[in-house]
């Protein structure tokens, strides 16, 4: 159930094993968090949810499929502009990145280089269940010494400049956690090391290309997909040996609560969701006029200024408040992909974190943050399409309250995702599995939740 990247990955894995597979999708189109559409004006193609895909680029499952995707890697993976007109630029080269950090260059190099060197040993753990016995405990312990710290603790202990601290803050804020939360630094470290491993690429034509490639592979293996098929109870499904659900824990309770054992059902009911997002997509009559010119070389831009400002923004969303100066995550794919907009025109994809379930219009605050680092941005806007948390959830039911991570990324929920079980994808019912981002390794487009769930199901059935 569910034709997002995890549902499709599960289906492909089952079909590769010779199983007869049918995917049921409630929406009229496939893709879940990897859909692309004309949201503003004709000819302007916007990613509805996910846009930049470092996880997809290193996914062992996607890599094994040899999907026909044209990956675009901008010269700069990530830019973090500052108020003085400069910007931190994260390039594929650790050395070139360190150079933009000035006095903190050596500290960055010492922090990141060993992790990049360890990536092949870290990947099996970081792209799978956290609670299982690690294959490479030495490499994992090296990562854990920094990753288990809070972002604030690691930043203050490692970096002397505002540039270094701000870079780590922005990367760690992808966790949706307060920057003082234990283990929050791990998210920032993984994203930064992936910038040097995979370069934070995206597929030409939009994220929809990933879902389309997976669907094509599934059909080539004999699998089928039905869109517009909303399932409200597992009792409505045709007879099946296995049912894999790319759904939230909340939805699984709705679908199967009457047949799930009480203890497991209550664990799912206690699952906590994190902050949501407010999203804005822009059709522009030209590129964003960044004050720091090199920001135009980046596919992704973090807009939040200093560590403390980003920290205030993330804590506000966590505590149910709306930040006056939100941390904004922005992608500018049309600078590198001519298929995204008509000739001479451009797109911008942006969101900020808000309280779960928020209905507040953050567009003016998002635009103020962009304008702060790119004076004249508002004059480039031709059209804007916004989405509140409710609209985000209506397009993808897994994003409960606008939470795009599949649940709050607390340390407890990283270990017990969504319940503490030897096989986290399994349920007490031997034929029923959950394979959404609420299972390991969590959010992002990599297909590993679905792939690993399907492998677990095949071992037991």
Regions found by a protein language model. Give the residues of each.
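N-terminal glycine-rich phosphate/pyrophosphate-binding loop and immediately adjacent elements
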Residues: 1-121, 408
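Hydrophobic anchor at the start of a short beta-strand
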Residues: 19-21, 243, 379
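A conserved FAD-binding loop/helix module that cradles the flavin
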Residues: 50, 435-458
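Rossmann-like flavin
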Residues: 83-182
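Conserved FAD/dinucleotide-binding core of flavoprotein oxidoreductases
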Residues: 96-99, 250-254, 283, 342-369
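A glycine-rich dinucleotide-binding beta-alpha-beta segment and adjacent secondary-structure elements
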Residues: 161-178, 325-329, 376-440
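Helical element adjacent to the flavin cofactor pocket in flavoenzyme catalytic cores
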Residues: 189-232
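Mid-domain catalytic core of redox enzymes
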Residues: 223, 227-341
């Amino acid at each position: 159930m569910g034709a997002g990247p995890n549902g499709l990955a599960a289906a492909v894995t089952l079909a590769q094993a010779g199983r007869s597979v049918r995917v049921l999708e409630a929406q009229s189109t496939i893709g879940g968090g990897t859909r692309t559409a004309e949201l503003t004006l004709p000819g302007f193609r916007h990613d509805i949810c996910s846009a930049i895909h470092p996880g997809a680029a290193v996914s062992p499952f996607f890599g094994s499929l040899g999907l026909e995707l044209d990956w675009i890697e901008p010269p700069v993976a990530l830019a973090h502009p500052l108020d003085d007109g400069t910007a931190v630029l994260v390039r594929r080269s650790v050395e070139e990145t360190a150079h933009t950090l000035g006095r903190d260059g050596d500290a960055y190099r010492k922090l990141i280089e060993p992790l990049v060197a360890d990536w092949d040993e870290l990947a099996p753990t970081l792209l799978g269940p956290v609670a299982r016995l690690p294959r490479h405990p030495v490499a994992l312990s090296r990562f854990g010494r920094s990753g288990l710290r809070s972002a604030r603790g690691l930043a203050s202990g490692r970096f002397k400049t505002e540039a270094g601290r701000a870079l780590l803050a922005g990367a760690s804020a992808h966790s949706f956690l307060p920057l003082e939360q234990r283990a929050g630094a791990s998210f920032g470290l993984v994203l930064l090391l992936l910038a040097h491993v995979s370069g934070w690429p995206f597929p030409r034509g939009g994220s929809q290309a990933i879902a389309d490639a997976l669907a094509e592979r599934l059909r080539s293996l004999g699998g089928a997909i039905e869109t517009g098929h909303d399932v409200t109870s597992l009792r409505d499904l045709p007879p099946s040996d296995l049912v894999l659900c790319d759904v939230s824990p909340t939805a699984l309770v709705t679908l199967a609560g009457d047949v799930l054992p009480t203890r497991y059902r209550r664990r799912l009911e206690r699952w906590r969701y994190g902050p949501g997002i407010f999203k804005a997509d822009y059709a522009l009559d030209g590129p964003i006029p960044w004050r720091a010119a090199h920001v135009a070389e980046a596919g992704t831009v973090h807009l939040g200024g200093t560590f403390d400002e980003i920290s205030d923004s993330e804590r506000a969303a966590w505590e149910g408040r709306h930040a006056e100066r939100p941390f904004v995550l922005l992608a500018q794919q049309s600078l590198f992909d001519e298929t995204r907009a008509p000739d001479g025109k451009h797109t911008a994809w942006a969101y900020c974190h808000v309280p779960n379930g928020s209905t507040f219009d953050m567009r003016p605050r998002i635009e103020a943050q962009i304008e702060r680092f790119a004076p004249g941005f508002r004059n480039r806007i031709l059209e804007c399409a916004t989405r509140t948390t409710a609209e985000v959830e209506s397009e993808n039911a897994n994003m409960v309250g606008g939470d795009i991570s599949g649940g709050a990324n607390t340390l407890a929920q990283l270990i017990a995702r969504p319940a503490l079980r030897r096989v986290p994808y399994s349920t007490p019912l031997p034929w029923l599995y959950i394979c959404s981002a609420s299972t390991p390794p969590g959010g992002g487009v990599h297909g590993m939740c679905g792939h690993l769930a399907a492998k677990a199901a095949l071992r037991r059935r």
